[in-house]
Amino acid sequence: MEICDFYLEDLKTKFRKINPEEYYLSYSGGKDSHLLYWFIKEYAKIDGIKIVGINTYMEHPEIRERIEKYSDIVLMPTMKPFEIKEKYGIPCFSKIQDDFIDRYQRGSRCKSVLERIKSRQFVGRDGKIHNSSFSLNKKARELLLSGKLHKISPKCCKYLKKEPAKKYEKESGLKAILGVRGSEGAMRRSQYTSCFTKDKKFTPLWDLTDEIENAIYEKYNIELPKVYEHIERTGCMGCPYGHYKHDTEKELALLNEAQRHFVCSYFKESYEVLNIKGE
């Protein structure tokens, strides 16, 4: 048995742990969630699982089309992008770093925030000195500490995606099946170590590697948007969090003029700090 088939059969075993009528697939239209869609509908033919997507206004056109095509229900965000920008700010460096910047800009001067902003080391709860993963470049630190840095926050994901899903779960009583993988980064590797989260969300792909996923896509000729020929992961169009891999610039090049203008207007201040060439 090929490794991809072994994984799919093991995935069947994982799905036997849940009652399908108590869960819904959180469908983003991306590579991982579409693999789950294909598995549920085509491979295992599991009935009773609703497919629920969210129109965040920020998806790549191909991804948005998939959401509309394959979802039973399409949710809308609790706030629109520019409403979030006005009230909270926009992403810039990384989710972890932006969270500390957000707290500092909202007035927090607690020790943990100041240590992470002003130095690369901090004293942990264990009393030992740790190297901080939070590090701003000189320009950004000077702008932040002088009060000249634009309003920064990672909250767009909360209001565009998490809040609509949370509301749907409360109203429907259903729990989410998430297409998240531990191999997608250090943070997710520590967050997802089994099929279930603490709040009973089902994460059956937590142990799926890129190699096996690609093998499944190739063997079964599963539909893959052309955007994946240019970038490894899709999220919100032009999100600055992809700048360290230069994915942000690649994404902008794929957009039409109107889409690029919208994205560049939304992330304008962050692009200027990061020297991302938009329009």
Residue ranges of predicted features:
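ATP-dependent adenylation/nucleotidyltransferase module used to activate substrates
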Residues: 1-219
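ATP/NTP-dependent adenylation/nucleotidyl-transfer catalytic domains that generate, transfer
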Residues: 20-21, 25, 196-198, 210-279
